[in-house]
Amino acid sequence: MRTEYCGQLRLSHVGQQVTLCGWVNRRRDLGSLIFIDMRDREGIVQVFFDPDRADALKLASELRNEFCIQVTGTVRARDAKNVNADMATGEIEVLASSLTIINRADSLPLDANHVNTEEARLKYRYLDLRRPEMAQRLKTRAKITSLVRRFMDDHGFLDIETPMLTKATPEGARDYLVPSRVHKGKFYALPQSPQLFKQLLMMSGFDRYYQIVKCFRDEDLRADRQPEFTQIDVETSFMTALQVREVMEALVRHLWLEVKGVDLGDFPVMTFAEAERRYGSDKPDLRNPMELVDVADLLKSVEFAVFAGPANDPKGRVAALRVPGGAQLSRKQIDDYGNFVKIYGAKGLAYIKVNERAKGLDGINSPVAKFLTADIVDAILERTGAQDGDMIFFGADNKKVVADALGALRLKLGKDLSLTDEDKWAPLWVIDFPMFEDDGEGGLTAMHHPFTAPRDMTASELKTAPEEAVANAYDMVINGYEVGGGSVRIHNGEMQQTVFGILGINEQEQREKFGFLLDALKYGTPPHAGLAFGLDRLTMLLTGTDNIRDVIAFPKTTAAACLMTEAPSFANQAALTELGIQVVKKAENN
């Protein structure tokens, strides 16, 4: 039906007769001439109808936005004064000789000239996806997956599918369950990741595996989370953590070079402890120049319990955050930031305004100045590198609260005061995570997942001191987003059972949930390691949007619903009966 795409016409096509198919993006009726901007997935081209082709001109008068049409015409160069430098096709136009209206369009529920609500965009997603910026994002996503497949194929990885209907495993979120008609009362789980299957593939001898795969997690949603999402899933045998990181770093550098024309360079490596200490986060945004600086040793003797208490507590921390130019902040802004850190458990926000650095105590403004000596102020200013016009905020509490509160404040200030370099790319690896963390109920939970191996520990050493264990794990972070994470896996049955035991999974439960894995570990399991990237999040970064729904064709809302199809929906009673399921209605309060 067509010979060319609208958006691909150039000066090289001048004089050629072309047939185009697409939609009316805009129509301008000048009486004797009608101009339309005609759009397809590749872009927009100007088409005009003149009196010499009366039939086409008459039909063109009926055109309205989003009519689906076919146009045949001749490509012409525009006069110099009419060249549109803002359009890829701005040097040419098409003189139409014939027009076919394939399908007309009703009045549109979306307004192309205004910002539409996200609710409207998701309800009429098929119209929203016609917008050039949305089409471009999905084209970029397709390019990314194509680049990934070629790269992985070139590096000896095999694309192997794993099951969608599987068994529930503990991976940190609730499973989506699928009832079995054949096995009444039993349920499949949709996979949160192909974790165990890819490990089993390593045990089967497929030493380099990858898959671009759907995963499912029934968890509370955020702007960068979806109940169904796509992973670039990778696993290898006989490779060290460093070797895995090198290959995966090469993949990501390849993506940025091909999609953005940017060489990310070598990725710096930072331990979890250093990231938390310096940035208050295990996924630090290195585009932001501010860092947390420990000052507890300077404040142990002050007569101010807010500082002295945490400064003298082994589990406490007092840290400072220097904000370049922050002395300009108003009292209201400071109060607003004080309320902001309370979200993260902080009780408030002490501060020092640095007016004249050289004057020390006499050159600052601070509600806590009366508790500080000149020597202490000089030491704080020296350690933080404060300059005239800076602000120093303090966090004083237990280590987690200080890291969370000042880490979040650092990001907010970086954005509010334009301190974060938005034109920069800042990738890094974060390694050496704690293997376990407190579950809040007196037990331990795996920081990554229960199949991650510890670094340099035997099973007996791990059992004796699990709190000291460091996971052989690694996360890739870009501009403050965790885009991928992985680890060296446990390939020894004794170690795996030890980890299960530490997590409170007894032997009977181990056999019920992971018997197949424990059996497989008995038969010459190779050392193996892997990683998974979030394709949606990578695409979000590479297309410059901060909303993951912008890079998924048909996403869910933050309530895990599809406004277009109205999923989820109630099942009919016959289907429920066949599955042996009875819906229990919630009792209404009178």
UniProtKB/Swiss-Prot annotation:
Record EC number: 6.1.1.12
InterPro entries noted in UniProt: Aa-tRNA-synt_II, aa-tRNA-synth_II, aa-tRNA-synth_II/BPL/LPL, Asp-tRNA-ligase_1, Asp-tRNA-ligase_1_N, Asp/Asn-tRNA-synth_IIb, AspRS_core, GAD-like_sf
Keywords: Aminoacyl-tRNA synthetase, ATP-binding, Cytoplasm, Ligase, Nucleotide-binding, Protein biosynthesis
Catalysed reaction equations from the record: tRNA(Asp) + L-aspartate + ATP = L-aspartyl-tRNA(Asp) + AMP + diphosphate
Enzyme class: ligase
GO MF term (any one): nucleic acid binding
Similarity field: Belongs to the class-II aminoacyl-tRNA synthetase family. Type 1 subfamily.
HAMAP family per UniProt: Asp_tRNA_synth_type1
Subunit annotation: Homodimer.
Protein's name according to its UniProt entry: Aspartate--tRNA ligase
Annotated source species: Salmonella paratyphi C (strain RKS4594)
Name of the coding gene: aspS
